[in-house]
């Protein structure tokens, strides 16, 4: 079961889910909608004792300092509680514009923490991205990471996305180690700024729907240092 929090991000028409194709192709896989208002309500209703306990924890990885840690903890605990309550196997969340605009907090630090715990989470309401990540998890591919494809040449491509990479895929010290920062765009908290480790064997893959049918692309590669 995949939970969609909100809808796909504005303008991302290709990410509009097809629940019927999903259910038919992937043997009964269910898409469940959860409103962003339900998420925010759950975040605001977080028990103070649980909130205080979570804020004392270090985030997995190399960083310990937190940015606006109360709201980040609220989102993390609310997402975790809703995932457990609805028995979700993966999540796609509309991470903008409502959460940073209306709640004052990007969900990326919470997403990173959930990803480090093994939950496939796709941003921008990307249900097929969450589906791809879930399949990778079931196949034992390791921690999945969803990213934009920025540019490429004949043998490599550059991937980048704003702030929710699992820390297990990053270096834990030195340049590129994860650091919590405000978002580069609107300066609201909190994103995880990090660089993928070099020398990892990787599987690049994607499911998508076209004309009511699912398609897939998959290839193998190896991570290397970015040029810039």
What are these regions (language model features)?
Residues 1-104:
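A charged, amphipathic alpha-helical module
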Residues 19, 24-27, 71-80, 84-228:
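Anaerobic metallocofactor- and corrinoid-dependent redox/one-carbon enzyme cores
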């Amino acid at each position: 079961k995949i939970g969609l929090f909100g809808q796909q991000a504005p303008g991302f028409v290709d990410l509009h889910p097809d629940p019927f194709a999903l259910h038919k192709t992937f043997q009964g896989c269910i898409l469940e909608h959860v409103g962003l208002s339900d998420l925010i309500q759950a975040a605001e209703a977080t028990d103070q004792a649980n909130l205080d306990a979570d804020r004392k924890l270090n985030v997995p990885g190399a960083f310990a300092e937190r940015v606006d840690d109360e709201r980040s903890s609220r989102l993390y605990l609310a997402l975790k509680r809703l995932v457990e309550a609805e028995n979700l196997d993966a999540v796609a969340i509309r991470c903008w514009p409502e959460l940073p605009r209306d709640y004052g907090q990007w969900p990326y630090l919470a997403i990173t923490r959930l990803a480090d715990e093994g939950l496939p989470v796709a941003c921008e309401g990307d249900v097929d991205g969450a589906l791809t990540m879930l399949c990778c998890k079931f196949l034992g591919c390791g921690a999945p990471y969803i990213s934009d494809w920025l540019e490429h040449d004949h043998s490599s491509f550059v991937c980048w996305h704003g702030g929710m990479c699992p820390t297990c895929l990053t270096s834990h010290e030195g340049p590129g180690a994860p650091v919590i920062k405000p978002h580069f765009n609107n300066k609201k908290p909190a994103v995880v700024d990090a660089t993928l480790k070099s020398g990892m064997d990787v599987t690049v893959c994607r499911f998508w729907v076209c004309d009511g049918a699912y398609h897939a692309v998959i290839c193998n590669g190896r991570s290397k240092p970015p040029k810039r």
